[in-house]
Every structure is written in structure tokens, then in C-alpha cells.
A protein has these predicted regions:
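Intrinsically disordered, low-complexity serine/threonine- and proline-rich regulatory segments
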Residues: 1-25, 103
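Short beta-strand "wing" residues that participate in macromolecule-binding interfaces
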Residues: 76
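Short polar/acidic secondary-structure junctions
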Residues: 53, 79-81
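N-terminal helix-turn-helix DNA-binding core of bacterial DNA-binding proteins
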Residues: 18-62
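Glycine-centered, phosphate/nucleic-acid-interacting loop/turn motifs that mediate DNA/RNA or nucleotide
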Residues: 72
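Basic, amphipathic "hinge/linker" alpha-helix immediately C-terminal to the N-terminal HTH DNA-binding motif
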Residues: 82-104
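Amphipathic alpha-helical dimerization/coiled-coil segments
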Residues: 3, 98-127
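Short, hydrophobic-biased segments on the C-terminal half of alpha helices
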Residues: 62-69
Length: 127
């Protein structure tokens, strides 16, 4: 079976869907990035970009960190750097760790179910 050429509207629809998918999973990704301990904002961005396809800008990450802080999932503090500007470090609260565990479980169940449904597509089935 050959693939039909994609139209501009189809490509746009897929792009919008991908944006929504990223937005929906970014909170979990940030919580997971903080699992190992304190990181400042740019370190979080680098962690998300390393070995993944999660390209996130500063205009996205800082409002998200503020929301996670308002929800009591992360804490932050300014730390003077030996050279350069002070950096704001973020880390998970106990509630943040619990939320990350629970979200990870939901994600594993959801992605497992979806991968099972996608099996025939990945195998190139015609039906």
C-alpha cells in the first residue's frame, strides 16, 4: 500500500496535534527532569532536549515552573553563582514526587494501550 501525499491542511492538522501532545506531557517531563535533584531553568531545558524530541523554549518553561510551584509541586530558591548572575534552582517537593509517580503510571498505561492499538499501523497493515 502506498501512502497518499499529504495536503497542507493535513500537515497543519498533524502539527497542531503534535503541539497539543507536547503541551499535555510537558508537566510530567519537567517533574521527571527534577527527579534527580535541583536544577536551574536552563539545565531543565537542556535535560528535556538531551536524548529527546522535547524542544521547549524559555517562554514555555518558566510559566510552567511557576504553575508547578503554585500547585506546591516544586520549590525554588535563588543561588548566587561564583561567576555571573544568580540562578534560580528548582526541585521537587514530596507532593511533586508523588504527583510525578502517579502521572508516570498513567502515562505508562496510556502509552502502552496506544502502542498496542498502533501495532498494526507500525507493521504496515492494510486494514
Amino acid at each position: 500500500m502506498t501512502e497518499a501525499p499529504s495536503s497542507a491542511s493535513d500537515t497543519e492538522a498533524i502539527d497542531k496535534w503534535e503541539i497539543q501532545l507536547r503541551k499535555g506531557s510537558l508537566g510530567l517531563a519537567v517533574l521527571a527532569s527534577l527527579w534527580g535533584g535541583k536544577l536551574y531553568g536552563l539545565e531543565i531545558l537542556r535535560t528535556l532536549e538531551t536524548g529527546s524530541d522535547l524542544l521547549v523554549g524559555e517562554g514555555t518553561i518558566y510559566p510552567l515552573l511557576n504553575r508547578l510551584k503554585a500547585e506546591g509541586l516544586v520549590q525554588s530558591e535563588w543561588v548566587e553563582a561564583e561567576a555571573g548572575h544568580p540562578r534560580k534552582y528548582y526541585w521537587l517537593t514530596d507532593e511533586g514526587r508523588d504527583r510525578a509517580r502517579r502521572m508516570s503510571g498513567v502515562w505508562a498505561k496510556f502509552s502502552g494501550s496506544l502502542n498496542q492499538l498502533l501495532g498494526p499501523l507500525k507493521a504496515g497493515g492494510d486494514q
